[in-house]
């Protein structure tokens, strides 16, 4: 009996210790009980960006998805992150400039959110150093969502659904701007696009057409007339399987740019007109193009790089002296070559990405 009594007492103390530990953890730290499995091909590499204090969990991702499409996070209750980043358009919106609060247009074109897991500098000028920072900036921006976060948080706290979701994701029902940013960032890290015809080609499951193969070769090759090699020199900035490199370039849009680009952030003259290199995945879906949406279609983009590069002191070295013709003053691609390149670019469309129900608006599902 004495042994049994000590056993029960020891068990009770152990259970109490565990309970106290759990209560303490629940009160101060997120509960990371259900990890979200991020799936992507090996050729994307493992140089991913996930902060230690914001691991990706199923609970956090679902909460982030709800918040991504939550119009309560805008001052007029009509705009969400999903307004400017629509799934059917590979998380862009088809406009040169997005209409923000009171239909005031934003200053730059909405960027695709595909494959942000590998990105370290966000926005066209790279001003945000992480997805958590990126997620909150548009919400606070007076010209975008224009939210008064303290007021929005009170509204979310008074709903039936959000306190429960925050408790599941972070251990308590308390809603904060930091937790909002973390949850949205978790959701955005799941927006992986890796099931295009190009991906299937890399896996040996798709045979490109002659036009697509020719376009791929031109895309990857540099224009070197001296070596009798024809190319479009795209791979300098877009040559990885993810179709971008984490670089900033002045791509010759203007000799004197109206938008200073990265220079406004760094103050460096060499950054004038430089913008972040964007992914070309799903590029056929994300018109109009460039930071100001000046090009309506891919044909206009190819024409720009082929014959309309504007010189400036900060012009990318990759765009200087490139020509397929000996002594040529421009790239010198033929109409057929440009058409072939566009055929290749269309291989980068991932229809499963734009139709994945895990990325869709959950509020529409809940309202049915």
Indicate residue ranges for each PLM-predicted region.
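Amphipathic, soluble alpha/beta structural segments
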Residues: 155-176, 253-258, 262, 310-331
């Amino acid at each position: 009996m004495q042994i049994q009594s000590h056993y029960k007492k020891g068990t009770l103390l152990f259970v109490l210790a565990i309970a106290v530990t759990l209560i303490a953890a629940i009160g101060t730290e997120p509960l990371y009980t259900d990890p979200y499995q991020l799936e992507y091909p090996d050729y994307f590499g493992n140089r991913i960006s996930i902060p230690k204090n914001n691991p990706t969990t199923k609970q956090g991702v679902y909460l982030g998805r709800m918040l991504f499409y939550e119009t309560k996070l805008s001052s007029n209750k009509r705009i969400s992150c999903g307004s400017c980043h629509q799934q059917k358009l590979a998380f862009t919106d088809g406009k040169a400039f997005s209409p923000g609060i009171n239909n005031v247009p934003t200053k730059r074109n909405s960027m695709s959110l595909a494959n942000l897991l590998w990105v370290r500098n966000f926005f066209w000028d790279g001003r945000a150093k992480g997805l958590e920072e990126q997620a909150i900036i548009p919400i606070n921006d007076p010209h975008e969502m224009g939210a008064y976060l303290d007021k929005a948080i009170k509204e979310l706290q008074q709903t039936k659904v959000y306190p429960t979701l925050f408790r599941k994701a972070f251990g308590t029902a308390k809603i904060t701007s930091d937790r909002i940013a973390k949850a949205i960032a978790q959701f955005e890290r799941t927006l992986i696009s890796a099931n295009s015809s190009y991906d299937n080609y890399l896996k040996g499951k798709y045979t490109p057409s002659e036009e697509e193969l020719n376009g791929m070769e031109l895309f990857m090759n540099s224009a070197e007339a001296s070596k009798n090699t024809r190319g479009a020199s795209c791979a300098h900035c877009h040559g990885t399987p993810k179709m971008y490199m984490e670089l900033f370039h002045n791509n010759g849009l203007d000799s004197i740019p109206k938008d200073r680009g990265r220079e406004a952030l760094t103050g460096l003259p060499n950054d004038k007109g430089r913008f972040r290199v964007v992914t070309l995945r799903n590029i056929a879906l994300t018109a109009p193009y460039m930071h100001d949406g000046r090009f309506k279609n891919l044909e206009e983009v190819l024409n720009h790089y082929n014959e309309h590069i504007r010189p400036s002191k900060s012009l990318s070295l990759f765009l200087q002296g490139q020509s397929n013709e000996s002594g040529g003053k421009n790239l010198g691609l033929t109409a057929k070559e440009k058409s072939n390149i566009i055929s290749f670019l269309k291989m980068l469309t991932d229809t499963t990405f734009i139709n994945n129900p895990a990325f869709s608006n959950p509020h529409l599902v809940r309202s049915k």
